[in-house]
Regions:
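Inter-motif core of Ras-like GTPase G domains
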Residues: 64-67
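Conserved GTP-binding G-domain of TRAFAC-class P-loop NTPases and closely related GTPase folds
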Residues: 2-8, 13, 87-142
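Divalent metal-dependent catalytic cores for phosphoryl transfer on phosphate-bearing substrates
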Residues: 185-292
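Conserved substrate/cofactor phosphate-moiety recognition/catalytic segment
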Residues: 10-59
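Conserved phosphate-donor/acceptor-positioning beta-strand/loop module used by diverse small-molecule
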Residues: 72-91
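Conserved beta-strand scaffold positions in the cores of enzyme catalytic domains, especially
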Residues: 27-31, 76-78, 121-124
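Generic beta-sheet signal
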Residues: 3-5, 44-50, 76, 193
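Acidic/His-rich, divalent-metal-binding segments that scaffold phosphate/diphosphate chemistry
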Residues: 132-211, 215-216
């Protein structure tokens, strides 16, 4: 059997260091380009690590489909590097050729992987994975408790009473998430969905951009991907399983695709394959999201 480990991580995330250590311990060959990857996988019983950002979901899906068509005995694992975003940006700032704008653009484009992309296995590589936070998904919280107990995490706390400054949203970011959490708790006892509602916009705190034009709406480009990445970091400290973390983050990252799934016939089959059996849950989360403005 051929084995491939695809690392998914940001610049300065420590993925190359982790890959080198893993390769030595488990006898893998590290490659960094598609050409090298295909050449190594041509060898029977090959064990290959693909050390690249691999951050864009559509590119991952295309590559996995290509590789599985070519190598029937290929087992593909995804190793997602969950590294604190503050740490990543601080490491970049220390470089002589620092380009923080580039790194932030990569952050906004990076999607957390999911099994539906074609992976046979997924691993979360988190450097502080131990229970340091309580889980509040099954406990009714007041807004004050929600802010204190959930949104106090670094970077996530930037959403507290952050105004949306646009024509679509009346509530602040933190209140929007809180009301979504309250409403979905009345409709389901699915703890992963409730957790997703609690955290679904936490990336808006660092993606908000305003214009010199006082009449222009603020923008939050990339906030869905950033919210998913921050949710992983938060959930790693809740002591729950990787399967639960990936499911919660899947809801956060994909509920906005429901409109496209319902309204774009050309995308329906593609999205059905990606969203799988979670379509109804994603619909519920998006309904709640749209109901609280």
């Amino acid at each position: 059997m051929r084995k491939l480990i695809m690392y998914i991580g940001l610049p300065n995330s420590g993925k190359s260091t982790h890959a080198e250590t893993f390769a030595k311990e488990h006898n893998y060959v590290i490659v960094k380009t598609n050409e090298e990857l295909l050449r190594e996988l041509d060898k029977e019983e090959s064990r290959v690590i693909f050390d690249s950002y691999n951050n864009v979901r559509s590119n991952r899906i295309k590559l996995i489909e290509l590789l599985k068509d070519k190598f029937e005995d290929l087992f593909i694992s995804g190793f997602y590097m969950a590294t604190d975003l503050d740490t990543i940006l601080k490491r970049e700032a220390k470089k002589e050729d620092a380009n923080e704008d580039f790194v932030f653009e990569v952050i906004k484009k990076t999607s957390v992987p999911h099994m539906n992309e074609g992976f046979d296995n997924l691993e979360l590589i988190g450097f502080d994975r131990f229970k340091t936070r309580e889980i509040y998904f099954d406990k009714p919280l007041s807004y004050q408790d929600y802010v204190k107990k959930v949104l106090s995490y670094p970077i996530i706390n930037k959403t507290i009473e952050l105004p949306h400054d646009n024509h679509d949203n009346v509530f602040s970011v933190s209140r929007h998430m809180f009301y979504a959490y309250q409403n979905i708790s009345k409709l389901t006892d699915n703890k992963q969905l409730i957790a997703a509602a609690m955290l679904h916009d936490v990336g808006k705190g660092i993606t908000k951009r305003t214009s010199d034009n006082v009449y222009a709406d603020a923008t939050f480009d990339g906030h869905v991907n950033v919210s998913a990445q921050l949710a992983v970091l938060y959930l790693l400290n809740c002591g729950i399983s990787k399967e639960e973390i990936f499911k919660i983050v899947f809801y956060i990252q994909n509920h906005i695709l429901i409109k496209e799934y319902e309204n774009n016939p050309n995308k329906k089959n593609e999205l059905e394959k990606l969203l799988g059996s979670e379509i109804q849950n994603l619909k519920l989360l998006e309904i709640v999201n749209q109901s609280v403005k």
